[in-house]
C-alpha cells in the first residue's frame, strides 16, 4: 500500500530513449492545465499509406483522386515515448487512454524507437556523432 497520494501516472518507454531536457515536465504541465485524461508524445504524421493485397496496392488513409497536399494534413503519430494519465482514469479503465486525449508534439529524434538491433546501432551512431550535439538530450551523466 502506498504511503503517499498522486494524481497522475507517467509511463516512460525504455525503447524510446531520446528525450529533450524538460520535455516530460512540460508535457505533465500541459496535461494538468488542459485537464485531459491522457496526454501522449507525438510527431507530425503526413505519409500516405497503401496496403498490399496480393499483387495490388490500395490506399488506406486517403483518396488518390482527391489527395491533399502534405502541408494540409494535420494528423499526429503516437510515438510511445511517454504517456501522462490521470490515476483515476488509469484504474477505472485499466488502460492508458481515457476519453479526453491530447498530444504533446515532439521532434523527429524523440520519435526514434529501439525495437531491433539495427535501430539500436543507428541511435548509438547518432549519439556518438555531432548530429545531436545541440539537441539538449536528457541523458545520464558519464562517470
Range-by-range predicted roles:
Residues 104-105, 110-143:
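Hydrophobic helical membrane-anchoring modules
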Residues 4-8, 17-108:
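Conserved core of the sugar-phosphate nucleotidyltransferase
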Residues 10-12:
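Short aromatic-hydrophobic micro-motifs that form the base-stacking/packing surface
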Residues 14, 85, 114-115:
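Single, functionally critical "micro-switch" positions that shape active/binding sites
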Amino acid at each position: 500500500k502506498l504511503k503517499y497520494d498522486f494524481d497522475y501516472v507517467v509511463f516512460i518507454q525504455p525503447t524510446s530513449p531520446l528525450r529533450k531536457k524538460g520535455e516530460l515536465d512540460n508535457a505533465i504541465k500541459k496535461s494538468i492545465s488542459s485537464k485531459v485524461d491522457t496526454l501522449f508524445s507525438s510527431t507530425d504524421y503526413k505519409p500516405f499509406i497503401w496496403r498490399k493485397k496480393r499483387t495490388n496496392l490500395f490506399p488506406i488513409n486517403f483518396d488518390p483522386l482527391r489527395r491533399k497536399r502534405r502541408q494540409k494534413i494535420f494528423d499526429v503519430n503516437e510515438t510511445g515515448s511517454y504517456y501522462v494519465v490521470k490515476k483515476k482514469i488509469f484504474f477505472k479503465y485499466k488502460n492508458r487512454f481515457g476519453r479526453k486525449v491530447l498530444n504533446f508534439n515532439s521532434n523527429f529524434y524523440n520519435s526514434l524507437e529501439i525495437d531491433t538491433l539495427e535501430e539500436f546501432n543507428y541511435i548509438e551512431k547518432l549519439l556518438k556523432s555531432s548530429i545531436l550535439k545541440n539537441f539538449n538530450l536528457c541523458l545520464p551523466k558519464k562517470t
